[in-house]
Every structure is written in structure tokens, then in C-alpha cells.
């Protein structure tokens, strides 16, 4: 059911063992079974996740995260939703923020690529600030870790850099 343009029928909860197949399929659809960031190959399914489940039981979104030592910081590793512009991504961000706050976390951060215009619109509207540009990071990852990274990304933008954003949880 829509209310004010947002889905109000998703439940956000920690990923459970029973979600593993659906989570794998969901990440595969979003080409995110493995990724590269900051010179490291990452496998999101190896990390904790929150899932957004629609009223019918289907996976509507998923956020994977990496808590730092003693929860001093928490990195959002992946965030994907089935349908954009319905509030599912915001619900997942707010849920990981609450989790991080309860753990005493001081920094919630995310890395995106320079072509991800949608993310660069989404995160600042949810309180994230751009803190760092890792120039050439995608080029280096393509050369040494993940050669299948395309040279041109979304909207025809050359894919070269990683952009780091953060907020307090």
C-alpha cells in the first residue's frame, strides 16, 4: 500500500539463514555478489545484512554492512532495492543507523562510484556528506582485482573514481 509515494508495507529485519538463497539471487540480479572498493575485493554475502520484506514475503531490498572494531564505525557495503523511489532504501538506511547508534557507533559511511548519480542524490538527502574522492580507485580495481568492471558506467559517465560519504548514525 502506498502512502505519500512511499511503501509502508515493508518490514526491515536482520537477514536470517532462511533468506540466504533469496539474498544470493537478489544480489546476483544487481550484479553485486562480489565487488571491489578501496583496493579490496569484497563478498557482501559474507557480511551482516538487513532485508526489507514486502507484505507478500518477497525480498524488496537489502543492505549489507561491515561493522568496524568495537562498532567505532560501520560501512554500508551494498544497498539495493527492487523498486526505487518508494522508501525502501530509506527504511534500510534508517534501520542500519538505529543499529549503529545502539552499538555506540560514531561513523556510518559508504563508498560509491563517480557514475552513480542516483546514489549521489540519495545519500546526501539522508544526511550523508561527501568526505573523500579516491581518484583512480576504480581504474586500479579494474586493473588488479576485477577486470570485468566496465570503463563506462551509468549515464555514459567514465567509471574511474570512488566517492566516500559519511554521517553520524
What is each of the regions a protein language model found here?
Residues 1-18, 163, 169:
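Conserved N-terminal entry element of GNAT/NAT acetyltransferase domains
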Residues 11, 130-131:
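Short secondary-structure junctions
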Residues 14-84, 90-94, 103, 168:
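Acetyl-CoA-dependent GNAT
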Residues 34, 40, 44-45, 64, ...:
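Conserved acyl-donor/pantetheine-binding loop and adjacent beta-alpha core of acyl/acetyltransferases
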Residues 100-112:
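Conserved GNAT acetyl-CoA-binding A-motif
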Residues 110-120, 131, 135-142:
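Conserved beta-strand-loop-alpha-helix junction that forms the acyl-donor binding cleft
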Residues 123, 128:
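Conserved active-site tyrosine of GNAT-family acetyltransferases
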Amino acid at each position: 500500500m502506498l502512502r505519500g509515494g512511499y511503501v509502508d508495507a515493508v518490514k526491515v529485519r536482520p537477514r536470517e539463514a532462511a533468506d540466504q538463497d533469496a539474498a544470493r539471487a537478489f544480489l546476483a540480479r544487481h550484479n553485486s555478489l562480489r565487488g571491489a572498493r578501496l583496493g579490496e575485493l569484497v563478498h557482501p554475502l559474507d557480511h551482516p545484512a538487513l532485508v526489507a520484506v514486502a507484505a507478500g514475503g518477497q525480498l524488496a531490498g537489502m543492505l549489507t554492512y561491515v561493522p568496524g572494531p568495537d562498532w567505532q564505525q560501520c560501512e554500508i557495503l551494498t544497498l539495493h532495492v527492487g523498486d526505487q523511489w518508494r522508501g525502501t532504501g530509506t527504511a534500510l538506511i534508517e534501520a542500519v543507523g538505529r543499529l549503529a547508534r545502539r552499538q555506540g557507533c560514531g561513523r556510518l559511511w559508504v563508498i560509491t562510484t563517480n557514475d552513480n548519480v542516483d546514489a549521489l542524490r540519495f545519500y546526501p538527502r539522508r544526511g550523508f556528506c561527501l568526505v573523500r574522492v579516491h581518484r583512480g580507485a576504480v581504474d586500479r580495481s579494474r586493473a588488479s582485482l576485477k577486470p570485468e568492471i566496465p570503463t563506462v558506467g551509468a549515464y555514459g559517465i567514465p567509471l574511474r573514481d570512488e566517492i566516500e560519504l559519511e554521517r553520524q548514525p
